[in-house]
Structure formats: C-alpha cells, structure tokens
Amino acid sequence: MTDQALWAPWRLDYVNTTNQDDGCFLCHYRDADPACDSEHLVIQRGPHTIRLLNRFPYNNGHLLIAPRDHAADLDEVSGEALAECVGELQAWTGRLKETISPDGFNIGLNLGRAAGAGLPGHLHWHIVPR
C-alpha cells in the first residue's frame, strides 16, 4: 500500500463539487453547536484548532487539522494556533500509529487553488496514513 498513488475513486463526488461555493465548511463546523460534532466528523476541538475526519478520505484515518481562525496563508495564523496545529499533528500521528499501524504518513497542506487546495481560504493540514 505504501507505494500506491493517492487516488481514491470514492472521492469523485468531492472532486466534482469543488467548484461550488458553499462557504467555508471549517468555519461552519467551528461555529456549529458541539452537539453536531459527530455529524460533522469533528473529533476534537482546542483553543486554537479543530480536528476532524476527512469526509472524502484517501485512506482510513485521513484527518484534517485546522486553525480555528479563517486564514488562507501561514503568515495569517497566530503563533499560538500554529504551535497547537503542530502539536496536534504530532499527537494524532502517534495515535494513528498505535491504532491502525500504518507503514507511513503523508502530512501536508495545499496553499492556494493552484497548489490543489479544495478550500483555499482556510488552510488545513492533512494527515493521510499509508
């Protein structure tokens, strides 16, 4: 599995709707009643971040880590939020290692539509177990 391309045919619904402007789902989930977290796949909230399962995952365990503040670029994110994001990346890769024993991870963010960002206005990290 580790040398396979990152393509998941079940993501086609997402790919076909990426040009629709329905607002920022991360801000919507951030502002929603925490009682709706399971419906929104939110697994944890922090003072500066929100963590959730990807609704259209490449692999099992595909997570998103995002700052609470709507920011398109790293220089728009506070130091506290960046530190919390990096801490959560570390914590969740550790949890995923313990629970699903992946061979590795793809971890990253896409800044801007040209870089492949499906939501270019609100940066977020992907953790994709491989």
Task: Please state what every model-predicted region is.
Residues 1-130:
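HIT superfamily nucleotide-processing domains
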